[in-house]
Amino acid sequence: MGRMHAPGKGLSQSALPYRRSVPTWLKLASDDVKEQIYKLAKKGLTPSQIGVILRDSHGVAQVRFVTGNKILRILKSKGLAPDLPEDLYHLIKKAVAVRKHLERNRKDKDAKFRLILIESRIHRLARYYKTKRVLPPNWKYESSTASALVA
């Protein structure tokens, strides 16, 4: 997928395995994987961090192939899903960091410009999540309250 605010074409991407069945060497059952997901979520890890740990430490390449559901759906069914979607959370965190940098370095014009780009991505993503009903319709990003969202 191409980059939004950069000249790169972004051609590299991960290749999913052709076979969607569970590997024969994997000894974990669906319930074991779900228990691992719940345990890691209670530690405060994000869904992507949970996926990386399951892949690297437990040999679960794709949780969806083993359990039949994605990690976020499993967390939602148990009520452990994060309030903000992960990509939106990281954009807000980045905007807070740039704004903090701008408080110390007022004349940094490039950072000011990059902050505008980051905040436009936040608004665009928030609009998408409102239409998908992930965020409530009255949710609004405000730079003054953003640091409280990511703290």
From Swiss-Prot:
N6-succinyllysine sites (modified residues): K27, K34
Key words of the record: Acetylation, Cytoplasm, Isopeptide bond, Nucleus, Phosphoprotein, Ribonucleoprotein, Ribosomal protein, Ubl conjugation
Main location class: cytoplasm
Glycyl lysine isopeptide (Lys-Gly) (interchain with G-Cter in SUMO2) crosslink site(s): K43
Record-listed Phosphotyrosine modification sites: Y38
GO molecular function terms noted in the UniProt entry: small ribosomal subunit rRNA binding; structural constituent of ribosome
Subcellular location: Cytoplasm; Nucleus, Nucleolus
Cross-link position per record: Glycyl lysine isopeptide (Lys-Gly) (interchain with G-Cter in ubiquitin): K27
CDD domains named in the record: Ribosomal_S15p_S13e (cd00353)
One cellular component (GO) term of this entry: nucleolus
An annotated GO BP: translation
Taxonomy, superkingdom: Eukaryota
Sites of Phosphoserine modification: S30
Cysteines paired by S-S bonds: none
InterPro entries attached to this UniProt entry: Ribosomal_uS15, Ribosomal_uS15_arc_euk, Ribosomal_uS15_N, uS15_NS1_RNA-bd_sf
N6-acetyllysine PTM sites in chain numbering: K27
SUPFAM superfamilies per UniProt: S15/NS1 RNA-binding domain
Signal peptide: none
HAMAP family assigned to the protein according to its UniProt record, in alphabetical order: Ribosomal_uS15_A
Subunit (UniProt): Component of the small ribosomal subunit. Part of the small subunit (SSU) processome, composed of more than 70 proteins and the RNA chaperone small nucleolar RNA (snoRNA) U3.
Family listed: Belongs to the universal ribosomal protein uS15 family.
Purpose of the protein: Component of the small ribosomal subunit. The ribosome is a large ribonucleoprotein complex responsible for the synthesis of proteins in the cell. Part of the small subunit (SSU) processome, first precursor of the small eukaryotic ribosomal subunit. During the assembly of the SSU processome in the nucleolus, many ribosome biogenesis factors, an RNA chaperone and ribosomal proteins associate with the nascent pre-rRNA and work in concert to generate RNA folding, modifications, rearrangements and cleavage as well as targeted degradation of pre-ribosomal RNA by the RNA exosome.
Protein name: Small ribosomal subunit protein uS15
Organism of derivation: Cricetulus griseus
Source taxonomy: Eukaryota, Metazoa, Chordata, Craniata, Vertebrata
Gene: RPS13
